[in-house]
Amino acid sequence: MSESGKSNFNIIIQKIIKKSLFTERQIEIILKKKRMLDDDFSLNITKGAYYRQVVQSRKKIEGLYYSIILLQGLDVISLDDSDVIFRLAEQVSKMYDNSDFMPENQEQIMSVIDNAVKQIVSL
């Protein structure tokens, strides 16, 4: 999150981040490391804090990939579930730069995502 407390992400992305394993700062750092944020984008943190967050983010991403491999390998996550997740991720990708959503649309979008995740997670 930027120094002023104002988020660099639209409402949908903010809500997804809150439900994810990552903090908004970690997502900003990941995007900066992947050069997906402007070069003039400033994180306003010390060099030590930045590198600590990079290491934490890398470990979380590794853990996430190992978890996906494990859960798919054990058929806890089916290929159909993965397909749903990837299609939702594609839609989120399209929303990343677009903050022009009406509030009712934002709630609808989050409801669709929440319902899809709950359906996939039901054990």
Whereabouts are the PLM-identified features?
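Short, Lys/Arg-enriched N-terminal segment that forms or immediately precedes the first helix
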Residues: E3-K19
